[in-house]
Regions:
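Surface-exposed molecular-recognition determinants
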Residues: 11-174
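Sec-dependent, cleavable N-terminal signal peptides
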Residues: 1-2
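Phosphate-/polyanion-interacting regions in eukaryotic proteins
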Residues: 7
Length: 174
């Protein structure tokens, strides 16, 4: 066996670095309601120089529709460094529907012109029945600066009965 090579993990950078929770919050009760202005309902900035080649950034976020007016739609967008890595369908959500998103972003190069590849999914509906999955190549992501991770939500119509609440949000290195 070659020195420094773990046959269980091969070339995985996990051999060199243990996973780390970067951010986690739950129960903030932050809501987006009565507005057609899109809102970053969940947001975290990965610190500058944190990401290394081989890192995997795992993102999980969960929201609940508290109230919905008629046929108004909600569109969730998961973003990494300002780029959409998954855009949910604009759905006529119902009260108590959920929005669940996850993503794995793999760092392939670091520096001022860093590159990454992402696989992400957004599920929306009472049981997460409507699923949108996307693979995205990310370029020009400056890992020497902070990188924002965001869930953006947008209602199609402003109405006092259009309410969505963030329930939990986490970002970790795995």
């Amino acid at each position: 066996m070659a020195k420094g090579k773990n046959p269980l993990y091969g070339q995985n950078s996990f051999d060199k670095r243990v996973g780390e929770r970067l951010f986690a919050e739950a129960g903030t009760l932050l809501e987006h309601e009565n507005s057609t202005d899109a809102l970053d309902i969940a947001s975290y900035s990965i610190p500058a120089d944190k990401l290394q080649v081989g890192d995997i950034v795992r993102i999980k976020v969960f929201c609940t529709v508290l109230d919905n007016n008629g046929t108004d739609t909600l569109t969730p967008i998961l973003k990494f460094g300002g780029t959409a890595i998954a855009t949910g369908a604009a759905l006529d959500v119902a009260d108590s529907d959920i929005v669940y998103a996850w993503a794995d972003v793999h760092v392939t190069t670091e520096g001022s012109a860093g590159t990454m590849t992402a696989i992400a999914e957004i599920r929306t509906d009472a049981v997460g029945g409507t699923s949108v999955t996307a693979a995205t190549n990310l370029t020009s992501k400056d890992t020497t600066s902070a990188i924002d991770v965001v869930l953006n939500v947008d209602w199609s119509s402003a109405h006092a009965d259009n309410e969505v609440r963030i329930d939990a949000f986490s970002v970790e290195l795995v």
